[in-house]
């Protein structure tokens, strides 16, 4: 993934109109930003371009306005937080193309920052319509993509635009691509992957790709129950996709063929109620009571996973090992996350994690800052793990 151009290749930025595609899809409540993480992560690139004398023109989507203006999906309420985090005023353009955009861009001086309105206010964005991409390109001299989280979508502002102007990866995109290369494309071996979450059905492609690429695969969360069921074990009232038993067996057979060691829970924390601090007990997976649910991995399984991490040099993690939102069913996820963080801090492990629940789980364990890289890109991270090409990245690669 090193064959893409970055800001280092862009030459002098003084006086250049830089169309910078960012991810500003932040949670809002009552017209205020409730979590500014995504804004904070793009600030360094905005600042770098502005300080080099570039005229920064921010392109972003927000919500799902279905190709026409929706007041609730306007980017305008983000302005105060963006200005505050950036430490400089940010102008606003009432549209991302046409006369309103052209006027706002024409008013810029070197080092100024402008946020244009939601790209999804136009149907051409999600259709990747050439004429819409050209209308966006009319306001820029070069294009920088900083939105890895939208890179799995071939939209006008992520893919079409990159074909029309000199295109570069922003610093956040660059960090993400470097981390992903270390994670799966050119990893230090052995590689261990941890895949959790509720359903096998949403992660079939992911599991099938990983068994061919990693040396050890830990399967946890609700999806592990489907594998245990496929092995003939009674999982009681646990979440289980019984209709996917054959799929699970196929994945287990593929792993065997590829010499990938599958690690499934040997014991589990079970309860009869799905609530915090429900009465619980640890049992082996051969002895799950018929009226109980598996809600976390047990102590023996935690020790096995920790031991496997000790053997590995690279870890890729997607999805929690149990119902981590409820105490004490967060024990497995927290213990394993903290163990991986210790190995990472000691320089013995490269750890890459991603996906919404995964980020929340690592933060819950207090180790969000300790992994080598934590991706905030849900869908794009998953599609990369599935081995799929990401149009937004390929468009940068094609220019190299």
UniProtKB/Swiss-Prot annotation:
One of its GO terms (biological process) is glycolytic process. ATP binds at residues 203, 325, 355-358. Pathway: Carbohydrate degradation; glycolysis; pyruvate from D-glyceraldehyde 3-phosphate: step 2/5. Keywords: ATP-binding, Cytoplasm, Glycolysis, Kinase, Nucleotide-binding, Transferase. It comes from the Bacteria. Substrate binds at residues 23-25, 38, 61-64, 120, 153. GO terms for cellular component: cytosol. InterPro entries: Phosphoglycerate_kinase (IPR001576), Phosphoglycerate_kinase_CS (IPR015911), Phosphoglycerate_kinase_N (IPR015824), Phosphoglycerate_kinase_sf (IPR036043). It holds the Pfam family PGK. One of its GO terms (molecular function) is phosphoglycerate kinase activity. It is found in: Cytoplasm. Its EC number is 2.7.2.3. It catalyses: (2R)-3-phosphoglycerate + ATP = (2R)-3-phospho-glyceroyl phosphate + ADP. It is an enzyme of class 2 (transferase). Belongs to the phosphoglycerate kinase family. HAMAP family: Phosphoglyc_kinase. Monomer. PANTHER family: PHOSPHOGLYCERATE KINASE, PHOSPHOGLYCERATE KINASE 1, CHLOROPLASTIC-RELATED. This is Phosphoglycerate kinase. It comes from Methylorubrum populi (strain ATCC BAA-705 / NCIMB 13946 / BJ001). The lineage of its organism: Bacteria, Pseudomonadati, Pseudomonadota, Alphaproteobacteria, Hyphomicrobiales. The gene is pgk.
């Amino acid at each position: 993934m090193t064959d893409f151009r970055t800001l280092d290749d862009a030459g002098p930025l003084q006086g250049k109109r830089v169309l910078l595609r960012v991810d500003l899809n932040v949670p809002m409540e009552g017209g205020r930003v409730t979590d500014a993480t995504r804004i904070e992560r793009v600030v360094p690139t905005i600042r770098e371009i502005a300080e080099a004398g570039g005229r920064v023109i921010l392109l972003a989507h927000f919500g799902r306005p279905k190709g026409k203006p929706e007041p609730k999906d306007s980017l305008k309420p983000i302005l105060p937080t963006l200005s505050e985090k950036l430490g400089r005023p940010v102008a606003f353009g009432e549209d991302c193309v046409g006369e309103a955009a052209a006027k706002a861009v024409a008013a810029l001086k070197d080092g100024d920052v402008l946020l244009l309105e939601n790209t999804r206010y136009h149907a051409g964005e999600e259709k990747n319509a050439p004429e819409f991409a050209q209308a966006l390109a009319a306001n820029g001299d070069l294009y920088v993509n900083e939105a890895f989280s939208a890179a799995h979508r071939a939209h006008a502002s992520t893919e079409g635009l990159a074909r029309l102007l000199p295109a570069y990866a922003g610093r956040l995109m660059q960090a993400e691509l470097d981390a992903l290369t270390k994670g799966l494309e050119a990893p230090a071996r052995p590689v261990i992957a941890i895949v959790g979450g509720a359903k096998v059905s949403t992660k079939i492609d992911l599991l099938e790709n990983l068994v061919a690429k990693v040396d050890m695969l830990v399967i946890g969360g609700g999806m592990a129950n489907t594998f245990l069921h496929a092995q003939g074990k009674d999982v009681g009232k646990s979440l289980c996709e019984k209709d996917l038993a054959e799929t699970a067996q196929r994945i287990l057979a593929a792993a065997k063929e590829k010499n990938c060691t599958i690690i499934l829970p040997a014991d589990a924390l079970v309860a009869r109620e799905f609530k915090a601090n429900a009465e619980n007990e640890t049992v082996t997976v051969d002895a799950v009571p018929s009226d109980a649910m598996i809600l976390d991995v047990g102590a023996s399984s935690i020790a096995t996973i920790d031991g496997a991490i000790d053997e590995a040099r690279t870890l890729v993690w997607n999805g929690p090992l149990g119902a981590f939102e409820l105490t004490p069913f967060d024990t497995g996820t927290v213990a394993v996350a903290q163990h991986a963080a210790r190995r990472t801090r000691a320089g013995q492990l490269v750890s890459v994690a991603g996906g919404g629940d995964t980020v929340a789980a690592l933060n819950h364990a207090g180790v969000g800052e300790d992994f080598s890289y934590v991706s905030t890109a849900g869908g794009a991270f998953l599609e990369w793990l599935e081995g799929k090409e990401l149009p937004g990245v390929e468009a940068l690669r094609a220019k190299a």
